[in-house]
Amino acid sequence: MSNIKLIVGLANPGDKYAQTRHNAGAWYVQELARVCGATLVADSKYYGLTARVTLHGKDVRLLIPSTFMNLSGKSVGALANFFRIEPEEILVAHDELDMQPGVAKFKLGGGHGGHNGLKDIIAKLANNKGFYRLRIGIGHPGDKNQVSNYVLGKAPASEQTLIETVIDEAVRSTELLFNEDMAKAMHRLHSFKG
């Protein structure tokens, strides 16, 4: 049984960024909310869109920060502090350059790997890196100088389909995480081939 109380999907705000690769974490939280029959609503107190869902009898908050990516910690910190949610009770979903579209993996802890959203969350959680992550593969442009344009760009239809397919599987694996445990959820998701 999971101890997760907060699931966060990282994104940049506004229509301009809604369909960009950098928003893959938000797409996951939006799909999880839809499957749970919840509506994400703007909440200025937490600088984001929030919802409250029940996953296998457990009360869980969903959050998509409405701050820009590099300020995601402001939103996560505000909600976590208010509800006294510890870092190890948080799952942050984010785009991952080092994995191909169609691949997603759960992970506990670790650094930020250059991801500015994770970097700010770690800073706002008093440098505690001990939260869970859902890494959603978006692929890499092949040139580090192209990364910014790449993550802020829209994926071609074939890649977008792979990302959406693995997000669907990640939602099913999240349900398994709450019904069973992290090991079974990881096995299912990590075995998936999109």
Curated annotation (Swiss-Prot):
Entry EC no(s): 3.1.1.29
UniProt keyword Cytoplasm present: yes
Spans traversing the lipid bilayer: none
GO cellular component: cytoplasm
Enzyme class: hydrolase
Subcellular localization: Cytoplasm
Similarity comment: family membership: Belongs to the PTH family.
Protein name (record): Peptidyl-tRNA hydrolase
Organism encoding this protein: Shewanella sediminis (strain HAW-EB3)
